[in-house]
């Protein structure tokens, strides 16, 4: 499938309805519109929206929480019609560039072992498996793989 170059912007209130709909499509325990709105006020959070450059519609989004020198990717989601076109990778690249530029020690994320596409994408950006949270997800019940990319040496190079 052809790669799609999206416009990545900070999430704002205008995106919340579409992102809440995306959450419902992608996750068994979706974040609500109100939960997403709270993140707009969170000084430790960075949420990005991927927009179709032709239509301006939301095609994906991702969230990052920063605590001290640690980054936690909370969400990465892309509408099914836009998957396998590089959208999630573009979002992940922005967060990796941010982590390196801000001298974060690492970025980490959790993913279902059954989500082979997300695991492959994360590995392509240098994430490696560091652990497993047993029975972390439900609907269906599944472990979470903990994938981490270290930036300590990169940031100090």
PLM features: what roles do these ranges have?
Residues 108-110, 128-144:
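Conserved catalytic-core motifs of GNAT/GCN5-like acyltransferases
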Residues 92, 115-118, 135-140:
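Short glycine/proline-centered loop/turn elements that form peptide/ligand docking sites
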Residues 122, 127, 147:
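Conserved active-site tyrosine of GNAT-family acetyltransferases
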Residues 79, 83, 112-114, 139:
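Residue-level recognition of the GNAT/N-acetyltransferase active site
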Residues 3-4, 10-83, 92-98, 102, ...:
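Acetyl-CoA-dependent GNAT
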């Amino acid at each position: 499938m052809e790669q799609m170059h999206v416009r990545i912007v900070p999430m704002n209130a205008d995106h919340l309805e579409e992102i809440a709909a995306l959450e419902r499509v992608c996750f068994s325990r979706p974040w609500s519109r109100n939960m997403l709105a709270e993140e707009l006020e969170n000084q430790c959070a960075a949420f990005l929206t991927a927009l179709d450059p032709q239509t301006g519609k939301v095609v994906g989004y991702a969230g990052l929480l920063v605590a001290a020198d640690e980054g936690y990717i909370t969400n990465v989601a892309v509408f099914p019609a836009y998957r396998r076109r590089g959208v999630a990778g573009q979002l992940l690249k922005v967060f990796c560039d941010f982590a390196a530029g801000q001298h974060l020690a690492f970025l980490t994320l959790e993913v279902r072992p059954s989500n082979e596409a997300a695991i492959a994408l994360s590995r392509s950006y240098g994430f490696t498996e560091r652990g497993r949270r047993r029975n972390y997800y439900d609907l269906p019940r599944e472990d979470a793989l903990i994938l981490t990319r270290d930036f300590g040496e990169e940031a100090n190079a």
